[in-house]
Amino acid sequence: MARVLVVANETIGGKNLIEAVRKRAEQDPETEFVVCVPRTNPRDGNIIYDDFVFQAAQVRVDLARKWMREQMGLEIVGEVGDPDPYTATMDAIREYAPDEIVVSTKPVTTSGWLRRDLIERLSDASGLPVEHVVSDIDSEGLPFDVVLVLANRTASSDRLLEHLRTKANDGGKTHLFIVVIPLEGGQGVHVNRARAALGQYLDRARAAGLLTAGMVADPDPFIAAKNALQMFRVDEVVVSTLGPERSGWLRADLVERIRKATDAPVEHVVATDRETANA
């Protein structure tokens, strides 16, 4: 039984990488796949805290595993790796003892990994066959649409979940939903509440058949949204709030500020008090 280590970050859904995985699975259905996602910062934009970077990488792992299970019937092991892709890959080699490595990068003109001679270094250090797959997701796109969902108290409301379910069933591309839950403060209790809100959302969303993963984020919802827009290639944004009489986000004009910060369409979903109380 062969074991293949797949190393990728932003290109994890790229067409050429998916084909490389599919080819190996068709040649040998017993092949095991391990996905390693180094937790790398975006090159431009705001400074992003390490915890957010780690969570973003974990979201990529979670969504890759779920998408490949649903679309390709593959059960894949995944992990977040060291920020340095060479170290992350060598750590995964020691942990999983693969027979082959597939590394997916952006084209040479935009790939920081290639500027560091990653492919040659891995081949020399590991002694394993290393296939380099180039995925130009900026021109090719992805086989799914990524929807960024920003919510907190309304994250598991009926209104939001119905909106996402309708979007997922629109008959077009598969939708992957990334929910971001901003903290309500900087204390430990706020972290626990945000994680509880995330857990409740994930339970309900997955029960509804949605392909989704999520993370907690900066207490400022605008910064949380901007950070997520830097980390992920987002096709749509959904912002869920309470009504205008109760929503601090609306008083801060959050929806319009996000619209000005991205070219992606931004939708606003309002949950009623009763929905929120029952969620």
Q: PLM features: what roles do these ranges have?
A:
Residues 54-65, 116-119, 191-199, 252-255:
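Short, surface-exposed alpha-helical segments at coil->helix boundaries
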Residues 48-54:
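Short glycine-enriched, charge-decorated loop/helix-capping segments at active-site entrances
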Residues 3, 100-102, 146, 236-238:
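Structural motif
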Residues 105-121, 241-257:
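Glycine-rich, Arg-bearing micro-motifs that act as flexible, cationic patches
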Residues 125-128, 261-264:
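Long, contiguous binding/interaction regions
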Residues 1-48, 132-135, 142-192, 264, ...:
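Small/aliphatic-rich secondary-structure junction motif
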Residues 72-100, 209-236, 276:
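Structural beta-alpha unit
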